[in-house]
Amino acid sequence: MEIQFNYESQEHHLLSDGENKTKIGKPASEEGITAKIEPLTEESSSLRENVLQDSEGREFCEFGDKLNEKDQNVFKRRPHNCDEYGQSFVWNTGLFRHRKTHCEKPYECDKCGKAFSVSSALVLHQRIHTGEKPYSCNWCIKSFSRSSDLIKHQRVHTGEKPYKCDECGKAFSQSSDLIIHQRIHTGEKPYQCSHCSKSFSQRSDLVKHQRIHTGEKPYTCNQCNKHFSQSSDVIKHQRIHTGEKPYKCDVCAKAFSQSSDLILHQRIHTGEKPYPCNQCSKSFSQNSDLIKHRRIHTGEKPYKCNECGKAFNQSSVLILHQRIHTGEKPYPCDQCSKTFSRLSDLINHQRIHTGEKPYPCNQCNKMFSRRSDLVKHHRIHTGEKPYECDECGKTFSQSSNLILHQRIHTGEKPYPCSDCTKSFSRRSDLVKHQRIHTGEKPYACNQCDKSFSQSSDLTKHQRVHSGEKPYHCNSCEKAFSQSSDLILHQRIHTGEKPYLCTQCSKSFSQNSDLIKHQRIHTGEKPYKCSECRKAFSQCSALTLHQRIHTGEKPNPCNECGKSFSRHSDLINHQKIHTGEKPYKCDACGKAFSTCTDLIEHQKIHAGEKPYRCVQCSRSFSQLSELTIHEEVHCGEDSQNVMNVRKPLVYTSTLFSTRDTVPGKNLMNAVDY
């Protein structure tokens, strides 16, 4: 582009400008001034401002190399020198205007009072107030207040990068970008913070840094009024509200709201980990991860909570911790009313609604909704247990399990219930417990109408529909739908009874059996019927009792359609159809279909007669015999029967359906 320049008119214009020292509210000839500054259009905005406010002579120096050969020769002759700064000028007027910059700023804005040493700078400044943007882009609808800004912008369309680094050959579209880039090679950091010893290569970085000291957050989100110290942060934040994800992965089409997230994501595909630790052999895909990792070696915890003094090695962990004190939960689910203190918790929660499980196990094809769950699951296959307890040496596959285990030694229960006096060592136990108070059952079965308070209960229940039994016994090949059932079953083979009663010498294979047994000693009956207020020591006994009031008989026979309130009654009934008599008398070899029939029969051999007639004091070994005898006493009240020794009632819980032999458990009968 050849620049046409009229030296005479320019010199005359500068002289007339120099003579006019009055305050300018309205420039006498804006067109003339605009024409004068157009040769500077190749300069960056930051440098241009310095040129216009420093000296007219420097202005000519900047564009002189764009002129033709004849005009360049004119610029080589610079007889007018500044004694103070040593600068040279082609014309006297240039030197005159330059000297004014040492002391004078005669051009003042009538809107805000800001003063300038040259009129052209005032003209540009006034466009801030007027909003005037006279320079339009031919490629798009954008307009600019300065021609230099237009030229820079047009390079977006043309791809022109005229400024090249001598060190590495990298090219830039703006000279200011080249200057900043060259500071990488020189190490120059000319912008120093007045509050601390930090220096910066860019002024904008210094401005951002100083907001750490001042606490200034000038950028506000118009959706939620959240404040930010950097404009880029508010732009990123607003994408939470809009859902915009403009950065897409070429490999898997996953989209991201931030370009930095895309770059990090792409390293999953490439496997690139460019940040190695110099203390150990670990490498990281993110520099921030390396910095965090190094604190493991140094033990540094630079982030301290103002509320409780607790220190953390990561700022993000401190922010999450502070939400315990503030109760802030800034991440709401758009499917339900739940809110979360962490974005990762929201993402994991949303997979409950979508059913998404993006993390497959390459050993067994099991799918997981969270990557951390996959990592934990892998340890089942590898047997790895990297977390060891300092107290007892026990090892764990998960760090969370070690932390929970250590609370056995310390007795710590940091999660108290706000509704009662109970405390818990695990937060998950508190959440489950609170559902007793609220009655919440958030986990619904999609096969039937049943709901559950815990997700694990739903998973177990769904196996009733699917028939899945993923847990196999190595000793007898028996399969179970629940891992807990397998563990209990394996104790049949091992004979293990790890739960000891402190009141007597009895041991139990299940903790639940110990708890039930201990109620014999305490007399506790915590389960009360809401209909008749009768109390029971076991929940299962209450459930069976309530069916007396409701008439519910949920156990139907497939052969004849007869229904029963108890599953054990159904099993006994089905033996009528099959003819099965698994209970044999040791004394005479007679077989019976139910255990109760065997017990009644054994009283004959023992000579036991617990049923006595109140009319004649005669005793009988079986209740049926007493009933027949009572018919002898005609007209007598057949209901005046005193059971000298109340007969034992046997339930399905007494003879565990989990592979135990009922004949060996006769002493486990309970009275309910």
From Swiss-Prot:
<feature type="zinc finger region" description="C2H2-type 1; degenerate">
    <location>
        <begin position="80"/>
        <end position="102"/>
    </location>
</feature>
<dbReference type="Pfam" id="PF00096">
    <property type="entry name" value="zf-C2H2"/>
</dbReference>
<keyword id="KW-0238">DNA-binding</keyword>
<keyword id="KW-0539">Nucleus</keyword>
<feature type="zinc finger region" description="C2H2-type 11">
    <location>
        <begin position="359"/>
        <end position="381"/>
    </location>
</feature>
<keyword id="KW-0479">Metal-binding</keyword>
<keyword id="KW-0863">Zinc-finger</keyword>
<dbReference type="GO" id="GO:0003677">
    <property type="term" value="F:DNA binding"/>
</dbReference>
<feature type="zinc finger region" description="C2H2-type 9">
    <location>
        <begin position="303"/>
        <end position="325"/>
    </location>
</feature>
<keyword id="KW-0805">Transcription regulation</keyword>
<feature type="zinc finger region" description="C2H2-type 10">
    <location>
        <begin position="331"/>
        <end position="353"/>
    </location>
</feature>
<feature type="region of interest" description="Disordered">
    <location>
        <begin position="1"/>
        <end position="29"/>
    </location>
</feature>
<feature type="zinc finger region" description="C2H2-type 7">
    <location>
        <begin position="247"/>
        <end position="269"/>
    </location>
</feature>
<feature type="zinc finger region" description="C2H2-type 13">
    <location>
        <begin position="415"/>
        <end position="437"/>
    </location>
</feature>
<feature type="zinc finger region" description="C2H2-type 12">
    <location>
        <begin position="387"/>
        <end position="409"/>
    </location>
</feature>
<comment type="similarity">
    <text>Belongs to the krueppel C2H2-type zinc-finger protein family.</text>
</comment>
<feature type="zinc finger region" description="C2H2-type 16">
    <location>
        <begin position="499"/>
        <end position="521"/>
    </location>
</feature>
<dbReference type="GO" id="GO:0005634">
    <property type="term" value="C:nucleus"/>
</dbReference>
<keyword id="KW-0804">Transcription</keyword>
<feature type="compositionally biased region" description="Basic and acidic residues">
    <location>
        <begin position="9"/>
        <end position="22"/>
    </location>
</feature>
<feature type="zinc finger region" description="C2H2-type 20">
    <location>
        <begin position="611"/>
        <end position="633"/>
    </location>
</feature>
<feature type="zinc finger region" description="C2H2-type 18">
    <location>
        <begin position="555"/>
        <end position="577"/>
    </location>
</feature>
<protein>
    <recommendedName>
        <fullName>Zinc finger protein 271</fullName>
    </recommendedName>
</protein>
<feature type="zinc finger region" description="C2H2-type 14">
    <location>
        <begin position="443"/>
        <end position="465"/>
    </location>
</feature>
<feature type="zinc finger region" description="C2H2-type 5">
    <location>
        <begin position="191"/>
        <end position="213"/>
    </location>
</feature>
<dbReference type="InterPro" id="IPR013087">
    <property type="entry name" value="Znf_C2H2_type"/>
</dbReference>
<comment type="function">
    <text>May be involved in transcriptional regulation.</text>
</comment>
<feature type="zinc finger region" description="C2H2-type 6">
    <location>
        <begin position="219"/>
        <end position="241"/>
    </location>
</feature>
<feature type="zinc finger region" description="C2H2-type 19">
    <location>
        <begin position="583"/>
        <end position="605"/>
    </location>
</feature>
<keyword id="KW-0677">Repeat</keyword>
<feature type="zinc finger region" description="C2H2-type 2">
    <location>
        <begin position="107"/>
        <end position="129"/>
    </location>
</feature>
<keyword id="KW-0862">Zinc</keyword>
<feature type="zinc finger region" description="C2H2-type 3">
    <location>
        <begin position="135"/>
        <end position="157"/>
    </location>
</feature>
<feature type="zinc finger region" description="C2H2-type 17">
    <location>
        <begin position="527"/>
        <end position="549"/>
    </location>
</feature>
<feature type="zinc finger region" description="C2H2-type 15">
    <location>
        <begin position="471"/>
        <end position="493"/>
    </location>
</feature>
<dbReference type="InterPro" id="IPR036236">
    <property type="entry name" value="Znf_C2H2_sf"/>
</dbReference>
<dbReference type="GO" id="GO:0008270">
    <property type="term" value="F:zinc ion binding"/>
</dbReference>
<dbReference type="InterPro" id="IPR050758">
    <property type="entry name" value="Znf_C2H2-type"/>
</dbReference>
<feature type="zinc finger region" description="C2H2-type 4">
    <location>
        <begin position="163"/>
        <end position="185"/>
    </location>
</feature>
<feature type="zinc finger region" description="C2H2-type 8">
    <location>
        <begin position="275"/>
        <end position="297"/>
    </location>
</feature>
